[in-house]
Amino acid sequence: LFSYREDKKGQVLEEGITEAGSMSSWIAAGTAYSNHDIEMIPIYLFYSMFGFQRVGDFAWAAGDSQARGFLIGATSGRTTLAGEGLQHQDGHSHIIASTIPNCVSYDPTFAYELAVIFRDGLKRMHENKENIFYYITTLNENYPHPEIPNEKGIEDSILKGMYKIKSINNNKKTKITLLGSGSILREMLEASEILNKDYKIDSDVWSVTSYNELRKDGLEIERYNLLNPDEKPKETYVEKCLKDSEGPILAASDYMRISSDQIRPYTSK
């Protein structure tokens, strides 16, 4: 757990088990910039299974009313809360989030990804005044968090939805491309080691911070190409990332298969 600072100018609401009331408070704070001319940065943390699934209509209303703020789906995923029973195992909150056009959603794994996403959200909502809100899922497992890779454009890649985090090229024969998000990225990293050690198979591992944002980019590029048939077709971000990949592509998340399946049209393998 990271420390936090309470400020007299800020406010912490502990509302208990009342999702509708908590979401209403978040919407009130998220629309204060318009209704009361007071700029606020509301952050609502909840079990990810008890967010969009419980208050989906309120989430849509937040989009309609152009609320700004962060929704944090904590302890997310289906494999990391098995001890608490099926009722806590979220496998579809990101699917519901994808139905709201001005909801920007991410499923990061490491702290530096979360920091980059949060900073961009603050800039877009409170500096650029974009009428969007963020849904970010966070995890409950205890694992090491590496430093941000020292690569040019890494922050932009995180925000676009995916970046290569690991590459093994020891065998030069067979290779596979592994895509993982959230808690499953760590399983992909472990899988790459097993493939290399036990089966002599090389691999590229990509951290997918948002299948939803990758799909949005794909739809935007598809529309542009449709409306501009005389121009050279543009490539989606997924196509740019994976056009030189070798072997089969395996994409996974801790959510329903439809989550990673969103980028299937933009892969060629």
List each model region and its residues.
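Thiamine diphosphate
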Residues: L1-T99, S105, Y112-L122, L179, L189, ...
